[in-house]
Amino acid sequence: MCTKRSSLKGSLLLLLLISSLLLSRSVDSLPICPSGSVNCQVSLSDLFDRAVMLSHYIHSLSSEMFNEFDERYAQGRGFITKAINSCHTSSLSTPEDKGQAQQIHHEALLNLVLRVLRSWNEPLYHLVTEVRSMQEAPHTILLKAMEIEEQNKKLLEGMEKIVGQVHPGDRENEVYSVWSGLPSLQMADEDTRLFAFYNLLHCLRRDSHKIDNYLKLLKCRLIHDSNC
């Protein structure tokens, strides 16, 4: 029976990795200007297609990574009750649902997406570094953390291009929410350290879901004139 379970678990893991790889290749195949190009023009529609696919990919990976960490490290520890409303991005005023988001002007919503993405640059870098040092950390968690860090940078770059097309010449100051959670990720106390990881992954899943929803709304509004 144990052998069958191990075999099934291995098959599911392989399927998950293959699915992630295929989606990653789909994302990378979308049109984008080559690095260093000067006169390359990508339509706003294509930029949004890529941004929406990237945001969905990041949210999928974030959810998988959180669920895997939760199952392996957080069972019976009561972390979820402590994680509510303790994200470093809580200082940014973000709409909680589609109805609230629809009330926000597209320029403000675009800038909000930029701020949230920038707020994750440093935490994602340290997440990768600290997961590497975790004893017996599943390799799949590290791979997902590395992939999310890379794709978040690509999404931020794409969003800057979108803002540049929607509002040419209007460059927003690089405002973002400062993260101060590194000491907690390095604590000697296991419970404190594991909760810090849990909370960070919980917040990443939450914010990636918000960004995914905001971008779908913005694409509908700016590309399809809200007819979707």
From Swiss-Prot:
Subcellular location: Secreted
One GO process term, biological-process aspect: positive regulation of lactation
One of the Pfam families matching this protein, by short name: Hormone_1
SS bonds (residue pairs): 33-40, 87-203, 220-228
Subunit structure and binding partners: Interacts with PRLR.
Gene: PRL
Protein's name according to its UniProt entry: Prolactin
Keyword Secreted listed: yes
Gene Ontology CC terms: extracellular space
InterPro entries: 4_helix_cytokine-like_core, Somatotropin/Prolactin, Somatotropin_CS
UniProt signal peptide: 1-29
Key words, A-Z: Disulfide bond, Hormone, Lactation, Phosphoprotein, Secreted, Signal
Role summary: Prolactin acts primarily on the mammary gland by promoting lactation.
PANTHER family: PROLACTIN, SOMATOTROPIN,PROLACTIN
Signal listed as a keyword: yes
GO MF annotation: an example: prolactin receptor binding
Modified residues (Phosphoserine): 55, 63, 119
